[in-house]
Amino acid sequence: MLSDIIPQGFKDDVHHTLTEHNFKNTIINYFQSNGFFLVKTPLLEYSNKDTGINTFKIISKKNEKKLNIRDDITMQVARLSQTRLSKKTMPFKLCYYGEVVRKRGTMLRPERQFLQIGAECIGENSFLADVEILELAYKSLSLVGIKDITLEISSRVFLDRFFTKIKSSPKKDEIKRLIRLKDLASILDILETKYHKFLKDIFSCTGSYKNKKNNLKKLKVDDLTSKEVENINTIMSKFLKRNSKINIFLDLSEIDKKYYHSGLRFTFFSKNIRGEIAQGGRYLVRKDDKKLIATGFTCYMDSLLRASSTKISHKKILVPFNISKKNLQLFIKKGYSILRYTGEKNINKKLARNQKCQFYLENNKIKKT
């Protein structure tokens, strides 16, 4: 069968294409109206040390450089800021969209090809850049009909501090595995007693941000962790003043799935929708042997389509082939999708219904089917 040529995780899409196109335009237009410059990166790149384990690699000859199909656009945009845009004035505000491909799907996201949309602010140290990106993400999701949004806040700073403490432990990998499972009791059974308090304090910061923010004080064990606690509270305070209705969940025991995040990171979820609908955070970009701070977010169209309550449809109308240009332009201006009839019969309700039209033009009058 012809359908057998499509691998698992890929598909022909004939039902959601119109909605996807409208959502993408809505989000990108919103980015641009907020001063983000639209860029485009290639689907293929040469392999390098940053190539992920879930990257789709293209088989090549021994004497040829290995090629990858991109599985994430964020780092491509970061590279672009170091090359083509390196002479431009900082900070850069860039946005993008494009297809990405994964070697393997997951239980929460079995799709292996999907449209990625995102925005990045590169070279801005102020916490206000984080607030702007959070608001940009939240508003973008709202614009395409996503409701009951929950924002999860995390940071790798605290677990990194913990892993540094136990770096010589032979059970470090097992401890990481148990942290991913949120199995604190089993971790404490194999962890040296002197490290118990700090790890328990990290886990105590899991829950509603409003209820758990006071627990963050316990994590101020050095300059870096103290600075990060203040950073989280400052960003959240500013964000909540302007977006008071959103639910915010705190989880500092979450191990970062993205290797490049350097501090604060965030994930958006929607009620009754599997998996995240958007994610982002702080990361570092190298420029002229210096490290620049960047922040951004990305969302995936497959998740947006599942989460959105908005239904996009054209007002489709069946009209005679020889309709005047004036009337044709008038119908287009009014938002109709025009289907010109090339048959010999007179246009009627039955014909229009057969063509999946909601309207038809009969004797110069618009009628509903």
Which residue stretches match the model-derived regions?
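Acidic, His- and aromatic-enriched active-site or binding-groove loops in soluble protein domains
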Residues: 56-62, 167-192
